[in-house]
Amino acid sequence: MIKWPWKVQESAHQTALPWQEALSIPLLTCLTEQEQSKLVTLAERFLQQKRLVPLQGFELDSLRSCRIALLFCLPVLELGLEWLDGFHEVLIYPAPFVVDDEWEDDIGLVHNQRIVQSGQSWQQGPIVLNWLDIQDSFDASGFNLIIHEVAHKLDTRNGDRASGVPFIPLREVAGWEHDLHAAMNNIQEEIELVGENAASIDAYAASDPAECFAVLSEYFFSAPELFAPGFPSLWQRFCQFYQQDPLQRLHRTNDTDSFSATNVH
């Protein structure tokens, strides 16, 4: 039986939060009881420190809040909640939203257009999400909007802009950059060979180093079996940075399931 941290708290608010139900999503079932307990402790603190702001009529209940907090804290389970400093609000639309985008082309001309976004992470501002894509982040598919945006926040701790290199020791930067760009090249080669829809990794990862880090962070936590075999050196760097090994968790869970199945009479 898990000794859940909220069960020993005197606070009625903490006791009322549906953490056990929130943990029931497929993405979190590979965690050990100890990891789940630690994750809930971080998520409780996250909800105390951050403000979740529903927009455009979206209804935010306690279960949704708990699951959002758990997904935010999964990448920093071993790093610590202080890695999520730098923002205080999470804005949540009910669905993908339209924003005005401004960009400069190769010859210096500035263009303006309206585009549909799933999420945004401002360096000195809030994280913006949408509930439809948050729901799609509960499974183990390789897609996770919250982890993607958290990865951008972790990335910018290393400098003024997202570069694809998180805050790691200086001696490791060159190796990280080498392996990250090699992964981008391999992903692009696969796209050219089989097309975007058939590629094993989301094509967005090949667009730019910062997006590669964010996309591969999604796969690291939600589809490690697709990330690790294709990019073993970069996988080890991610394990070292996040101080977690989701593939080992997956194998442990599969072994447990296999053992249980063979002992059913």
UniProtKB/Swiss-Prot annotation:
Presence of the UniProt keyword Metal-binding in the record: yes
Cofactor binding note: Binds 1 zinc ion per subunit.
UniProtKB keywords: Aminopeptidase, Cytoplasm, Hydrolase, Metal-binding, Metalloprotease, Protease, Zinc
Gene3D superfamilies: Collagenase (Catalytic Domain), Glucose-regulated metallo-peptidase M90, N-terminal domain
GO MF: aminopeptidase activity; metallopeptidase activity; zinc ion binding
One matching Pfam family: Peptidase_M90
Cofactors, names only: Zn(2+)
Binding site for Zn(2+): 111, 148, 152, 211
GO cellular component: cytosol
Protein localization: Cytoplasm
Domain of life: Bacteria
One BP term from GO: proteolysis
InterPro entries: MetalloPept_cat_dom_sf (IPR024079), MtfA_enterob (IPR057256), MtfA_fam (IPR010384), MtfA_N (IPR042252)
Coiled-coil regions, chain positions: none
EC number: 3.4.11.-
Record NCBIfam families: PRK15410.1 (NF011939)
PANTHER family reported for this sequence: MTFA PEPTIDASE, PROTEIN MTFA
Quaternary structure annotation from Swiss-Prot or TrEMBL: Interacts with Mlc.
Family named by the database record: Belongs to the MtfA family.
Protein purpose: Involved in the modulation of the activity of the glucose-phosphotransferase system (glucose-PTS). Interacts with the transcriptional repressor Mlc, preventing its interaction with DNA and leading to the modulation of expression of genes regulated by Mlc, including ptsG, which encodes the PTS system glucose-specific EIICB component. Shows zinc-dependent metallopeptidase activity.
Protein name: Mlc titration factor A
The organism of origin for this protein: Escherichia coli O139:H28 (strain E24377A / ETEC)
Upper classification of the organism: Bacteria, Pseudomonadati, Pseudomonadota, Gammaproteobacteria, Enterobacterales
